[in-house]
Design a protein with these regions (language model features):
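Amphipathic alpha-helical dimerization/coiled-coil segments
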Residues: 75-126
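A short, conserved structural fragment
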Residues: 46-58
Length: 130
């Protein structure tokens, strides 16, 4: 499934929020977003079932739908990530990719937690492959 850069931006905004957002709230997150741009992207994302209406809220005197990402969107984004890695794995090796992913985590405690999860995952995978 193809997601254009603008739709991906909208998904990132929704994933970074701890609550479902209205179109107006999404527009207010970035200066380069307009109501019409966001509404167009929202329609496409809804049709593709990558987002869903997660509630209704008043925005002034108007009822507005609140949108949030679906599990399907997580799967599509993950597949896009894997496809990108496949395209570049001859240039960026496994070790470099993992180191890079760990380095972008600024919270040292979270990084340690991620390393522990990775060690556990690798141990399980090694055990299952034997």
């Amino acid at each position: 499934m193809k997601i254009n850069p603008r739709e991906l931006d909208i998904l990132k905004i929704l994933y970074s929020s701890d609550q479902a957002l209205t179109v107006t709230q999404i527009v207010n997150t970035r200066e380069d977003l307009t109501q019409s741009i966001v509404q167009t992207a929202i329609r496409k994302l809804l049709a593709a079932e990558l987002i869903e209406v997660q509630g209704i809220a008043y925005s002034g005197n108007v009822l507005s739908r609140r949108f949030g990402p679906t599990e399907k969107s997580r799967e599509v984004i993950f597949q896009r990530f894997l496809d990108s890695y496949r395209d570049y794995k001859c240039i960026i090796g496994f070790r470099t990719a993992v180191e890079g992913m760990l380095e972008i985590e600024e919270d040292k405690a979270k990084r340690v937690e991620d390393i522990e999860v990775l060690v556990k995952l690798l141990t399980e995978m090694k055990t299952n492959d034997q």
